[in-house]
Amino acid sequence: MRNKDFELLAPAGNLEILKGVIESGADAVYVGGSMFGARAYANNFTEEELLEAIDFAHLRGVKVYLTVNTLIKNSEFSKLYDYLLVYYKRGLDAVIVQDIGVVKAIHEYFPSMEIHTSTQMTVTGADGVRFLSQFGVTRVVMAREVSLAEMKRIHEETGMELEAFVHGALCYSYSGQCLFSSILGGRSGNRGRCAQPCRLPYTVEGKKDEYILSLKDMCGIKALDKLHDAGVYSLKIEGRMKQLEYACGVVKYYRNYIDSKKPVSDADYDRIKELGNRCGFTDRYYFDHNGSDMVTYVKPNFVSNAAEPSPEKRKLSIEGELVLREGEPGSLTVKRGDVTYKASIEPVSAALKAPLDKKAAIDRINKTGDTDFEFSHIKAQIGENVFVPNGALNKLRRDAISGLCDKQIGRAHV
């Protein structure tokens, strides 16, 4: 396990939502690309968008996971390597996989890539976890039906990093095992094309138009302490097809209660409901096998009265140290967290007329413009009789910020 209580894992159906959930407090984001994802009808990321997403997230210390969570035909395997290679080189943090053959192939193709098994793999016990570990799996996403007591036992017996769904839609059947949509309409959930027939009304014993297969949405925000005690590391929010306000709002509330460790207020719980729900919430799977109170019965539609404001883009705070001494190369060292970068210019010359003013130099360095950064503090060591042109100071700032940006983003697999 890593040195933090939880990873808050958020969905993103497009680049705008990805940026929004990161600004709202997500530790990691999962997305779908142009192939092999379980949301074939979503507006999935293009290659260009996904590469931008990886850079945006990594600059902020956030991880990106790519869904490869459908069953893949033999004829499609030849496309898998080329599809993933560009993201692997960019530093994609992990793939989320359903097909055991794909797990084996990715581990062979990209041995340093983390592999997370999808909930579509229906892992419900320690034996399944042990089986998967031999193929390089680094995290297992628990089936939604697994209780907290079972998760605790699985974690204690295997030591595997566990991820559990904490919020969002529930399937009536085990994810990855349901053929209802395939049989009824020829659209396979295992190929990302589920038609959701469980959300339709049915006649049972003469009773018409009852939604007997439509489950309420999950909400586990009141069980965070119990999830922690069960050994769950990653808390997954469902919703790659949800809107910006929903995704950002849910992330904001979970972020607040993960960090504060306070009991969830009734007012906030009601506000989370307003963001979106199906006839209320349930967390019964955490504690019981099932129950009739999990079913919506009267209406299956997702109701949202989202009124949460979209998060504003925040600048990333950095520190700077400016050194300008006569006869020595001028330098600007910038630091964010434990990442530093030093940029230099030609040796500083003596002033022929008016020497460089210290405040003016600091003000010049402070002009970060439309970059992602802003200085929280600049320490300056400037000689008494030196001169540096504004253009050189601008270049020093640009080079330092660009270098820090490249270093922060990194290239994890090359």
What are these regions, as identified by a protein language model?
Residues 1-24, 28-39, 53-54, 60-88, ...:
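Surface-exposed amphipathic alpha-helical tracts and adjacent flexible/coil segments at the periphery
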Residues 42-51:
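Aromatic- and glycine-enriched glycan-recognition loops and surfaces
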Residues 105:
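Basic, amphipathic alpha-helical recognition segments used for DNA target recognition
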Residues 119:
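Residues at the C-termini of beta-strands that transition into short coil/loop
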Residues 122:
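Beta/alpha (TIM)-barrel catalytic core signal, keyed to glycine-rich beta->alpha loops juxtaposed to Asp/Glu
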Residues 126-127:
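Conserved nucleotide-cofactor-binding alpha/beta core module
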